């Protein structure tokens, strides 16, 4: 979808931003750095005790800059570009005689490998040598690691050591082992040579053997001339399998592409074996050193702001994120015990252990709404995948149950109101602390408890009576006279709030609201939300107005929702003035949701994925490809007049067949694999087709969820459909059904 011939996938400039925090990042699921930065980080490697724990700084061999020697006597054009198609950062110098380029990347299929390559090509006749400089400031030192130099391995230097201070007393001091091929001070295209390329590798592991094995694998690919090709092809395949685009303004398209690129960069390649998630922090793996981007800690940002879009495009990574919460459950149980409560209280700021590592106690004690965000992520995952194995055998049920137990021990009964109260909390609006009955938090309590009860029933487990009693009787503040939800007991309209809070009710938090109340909540809080608040706020106001079909207000807020994106590499800052966390995945996640869930109207429910597309001015078409739902991959696109849905792949014969139920006609259209189905734009739901009648031919398993037959995410056997012949299209007028 090209707009006026512009490419929304490559972000180029002739100079770098003056603020080095805004340089592009290159990351994969294990390693991350900013280009031309002296530090790299390793996933899950933290140094420092308690609230001082932060991502350990490892010196980066990629901190090398290509330069022309002084006095070369040529006018050179310098270009810097982030190519999202290949997950690569390119620095190019071009003159009349030559073109030299440096390509920096975090390898997509070898996550323990970072690399850069330098190429020099002759452009004009002549045979003289051409020499370029490589400026490096590498120093084998770190304030966080006790590092030592070891023997070279296959031409690579070796640096190893361990963190200085464990997160908790007696905890592990994590090992880091790094091998790298050092860059020389200059490179020369020899006399008579037309072109040449040099590769420089960095391999990092948790042991010497792991680092050596990873470097060896990379060197083998390099010897075959396939090192960069394997990386670029993996990115190309990823973009084939998932995508998000609009026919609309270039800046919006670039914002969508950049946000999805940075989020996908934090995740493993689909079907990658052995991936262990150590959580996603607001600034990503490229940031998080001491006193930087919240020290690399994991917040509710992961579960509420990043997770929903990840789930739709990459359910394996979504499961790995939930496994991080399962793995840190012991820490959450201890957090609750330390506060005098039962069950689990997930840390407001979490690192390796799951114990609270927030430097300021007030947030760890009061922002209990993180628990609700964690359980909501488990709920969305369950409805999307029906992966009962995660809950039956892999610890998911333990998390959901422990949070339910925490809520029941944390609430207090009010005889006067005959309601359960939740006192002394802080909601997302951090301008107000120690409040009673945050409406956002209390609705999350309801949601957590009701999901816990429903899941217990599906698992054949007893349901404690207190769970539904608290869910039904917890106070949900509502002002009948003014027809809106006060943020908490005693909130007065007009009080300034920090960020989206009450407006999260309805989406992303499931909660039934009349259109009038939804509108009033939006109007009241939009007027008093601080313009200095974090980036994800305005995307949720945009979603709210999309729900109400107010396209004008929604479009203005959608544009405002990516105003924190900095040029030229589309790196986000937490706050509009450029302060706060950078490469702010939280803000990107909120913005992506504004399109993936706002424009489409997608809502993941127990019955299916509902849709209700809305067209905004200046956007004539929205396309979302590679959506996952119960073992099926779908493409969903719409314009002013029509909606098109196509099932493009199935994970196996156990994946249920789907249909689209249109509203209000109740027409049901079969979504046959390999066929496009188009219908006039309307609301509806994508859902499982009813089981075949007895005796009919079917590959489905009537009466059983597909997770009963096979774990849907363990080595899925994706079958791509329609690749050998043109995809058939079926256009349906529901009125004729």
UniProtKB/Swiss-Prot annotation:
Pfam families referenced in this protein's UniProt entry, alphabetically: Glyco_hydro_65m
Catalytic activity: (5R)-5-O-[alpha-D-glucosyl-(1->2)-beta-D-galactosyl]-5-hydroxy-L-lysyl-[collagen] + H2O = (5R)-5-O-(beta-D-galactosyl)-5-hydroxy-L-lysyl-[collagen] + D-glucose
Principal EC category: hydrolase
Entry-linked InterPro entries: 6-hairpin_glycosidase_sf, 6hp_glycosidase-like_sf, Glyco_hydro_65_M
GO MF annotations, alphabetized: protein-glucosylgalactosylhydroxylysine glucosidase activity
Annotated consequence of substituting residue 301 to E/N: Abolishes catalytic activity
EC number: 3.2.1.107
Binding site for substrate: 300-301, 498-499
Organism of provenance: Homo sapiens (Human)
Active site: 430
Protein name: Protein-glucosylgalactosylhydroxylysine glucosidase
Keyword entries, A-Z: Glycosidase, Hydrolase
GO annotation, biological process: carbohydrate metabolic process
Ranges of Polar residues composition bias in the record: 721-730
Domain of life: Eukaryota
GO terms for cellular component: cytosol
């Amino acid at each position: 979808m090209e707009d006026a011939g512009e490419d929304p996938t490559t972000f180029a400039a002739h100079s770098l931003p003056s603020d080095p925090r805004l340089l592009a990042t290159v990351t994969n699921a294990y390693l991350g750095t900013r280009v031309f930065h002296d530090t790299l980080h390793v996933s899950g490697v933290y140094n420092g005790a308690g609230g001082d724990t932060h991502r350990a700084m490892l010196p980066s061999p990629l901190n090398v800059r290509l330069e022309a020697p002084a006095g070369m006597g040529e006018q050179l054009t310098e270009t810097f570009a982030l190519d999202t198609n290949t997950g690569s950062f390119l620095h190019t110098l071009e003159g009349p005689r030559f073109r030299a380029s440096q390509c920096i990347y975090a390898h997509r299929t070898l996550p323990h490998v970072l690399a850069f390559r330098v190429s020099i090509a002759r452009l004009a006749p002549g045979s003289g040598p051409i020499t370029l400089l490589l400026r490096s400031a590498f120093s084998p030192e770190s304030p966080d690691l006790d590092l030592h130099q070891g023997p070279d391995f296959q031409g690579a230097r070796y640096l190893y050591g361990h963190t200085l201070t464990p997160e908790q007393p007696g905890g592990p001091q994590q090992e880091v082992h790094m091998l790298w091929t050092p860059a020389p001070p200059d490179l020369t295209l020899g006399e008579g040579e037309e072109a040449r390329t040099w590769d420089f590798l960095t391999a990092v592991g948790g042991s010497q053997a792991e680092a050596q094995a990873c470097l060896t694998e990379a060197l083998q690919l390099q010897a075959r001339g396939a090192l960069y090709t394997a990386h670029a092809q993996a990115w190309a395949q990823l973009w084939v399998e998932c995508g998000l685009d609009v026919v609309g303004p270039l800046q919006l398209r670039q914002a969508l592409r950049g946000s999805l690129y940075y989020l996908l960069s934090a995740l493993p390649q689909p079907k990658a074996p052995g991936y262990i998630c150590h959580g996603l922090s607001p600034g990503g793996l490229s940031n998080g050193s001491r006193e930087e981007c919240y020290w690399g800690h994991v917040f509710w940002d992961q579960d509420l702001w990043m997770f929903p879009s990840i789930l739709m495009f990459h359910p394996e990574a979504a499961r790995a994120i939930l496994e991080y919460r399962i793995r840190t459950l012991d820490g959450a149980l201890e957090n609750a015990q330390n506060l005098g409560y039962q069950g689990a209280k997930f840390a407001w700021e979490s690192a390796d252990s799951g114990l609270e590592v927030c430097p300021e106690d007030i947030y760890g004690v009061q922002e209990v709404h993180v628990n609700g965000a964690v359980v909501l992520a488990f709920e969305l995952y369950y409805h999307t995948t029906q992966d009962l194995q995660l809950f039956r055998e892999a610890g998911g049920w333990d998390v959901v149950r422990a949070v339910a137990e925490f809520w029941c021990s944390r609430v207090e009964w009010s005889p006067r109101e005959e309601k359960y109260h939740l006192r002394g909390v802080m909601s997302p609006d951090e301008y107000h602390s120690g409040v009673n009955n945050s409406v956002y938090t209390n609705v999350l309590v309801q949601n957590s408890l009701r999901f816990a009860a429903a899941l217990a029933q599906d698992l054949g487990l007893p349901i404690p009576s207190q769970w539904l009693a608290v869910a039904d009787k917890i106070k949900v503040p509502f002002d009948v006279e003014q027809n809106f939800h006060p943020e908490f007991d005693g909130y007065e309209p007009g009080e300034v709030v920090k960020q989206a809070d009450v407006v999260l009710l309805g989406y992303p938090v499931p909660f039934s609201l009349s259109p009038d109340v939804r509108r009033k909540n939006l109007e009241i809080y939009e007027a008093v939300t601080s313009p200095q608040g974090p980036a994800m706020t305005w995307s949720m106001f945009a979603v709210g107005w999309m729900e109400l079909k107010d396209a004008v207000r929604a479009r203005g807020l959608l544009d405002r929702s990516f105003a924190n994106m900095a040029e030229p590499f589309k790196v986000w800052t937490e706050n509009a003035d450029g302060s706060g966390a950078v490469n702010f995945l939280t803000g990107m996640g909120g913005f992506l949701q504004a399109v993936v869930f706002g424009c489409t109207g997608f809502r993941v429910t127990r019955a299916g994925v509902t849709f209700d597309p809305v067209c905004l001015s200046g956007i004539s078409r929205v396309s979302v490809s590679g959506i996952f739902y119960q073992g099926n991959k779908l493409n969903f696109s719409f314009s002013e007049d029509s909606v098109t849905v196509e099932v493009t792949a199935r994970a196996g014969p156990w994946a249920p067949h789907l249909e689209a139920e249109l509203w209000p006609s109740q027409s049901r259209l079969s979504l046959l694999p390999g066929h496009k189905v188009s219908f006039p734009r309307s609301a509806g739901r994508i859902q499982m087709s009813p089981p075949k009648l007895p005796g009919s031919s079917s590959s489905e398993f009537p009466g059983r969820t597909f997770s009963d037959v096979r774990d849907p995410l363990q080595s899925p056997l994706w079958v791509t459909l329609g690749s050998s012949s043109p995809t058939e299209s079926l256009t349906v007028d529901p009125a004729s059904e």
